Amino acid sequence: DKTNYNKKLITSDALVWTFRNNKSVVKNPEMYGWTKLDKVGQVSRVSCKVPISDTPIKDHAITGSFSFRKAEHFLEYCDKTIFKNRRINNEFYLDIVLDECVIGGLNVQPFEVDEYNSWGTPLDLENYLKK
């Protein structure tokens, strides 16, 4: 909801939009980015294409959307990701930019959505259209 979003954004440096309890992640957890949370619910690590546990359906998977309170943070940590050449499968991913934000000490919070529809594969789209 918009109120929760605005509150979280003004109290953090960046938001990682996440979802949980979606069966699509069980079939192929290597298709997703993942966030590990600390005891107070702040993002302590972001993993790209590598699940963070043996129970991915319970973990915060990344929707692919991110919010930054300041554009400067986004640009700075994109540059750091590129400078460090942090590629996955020879490509740069925004998930890793958020991991760099965590490493850099920024306050990165999850913003969990109630529902997520994955269209990452033709089968995902076909299953969605059957709903």
Where are these regions (language model features)?
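Conserved beta-loop-beta/alpha segment of the NTase-like Rossmann-fold superfamily
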Residues: D1-L37
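Hydrophobic transmembrane alpha-helix bundles
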Residues: P29-K36, L123-K131
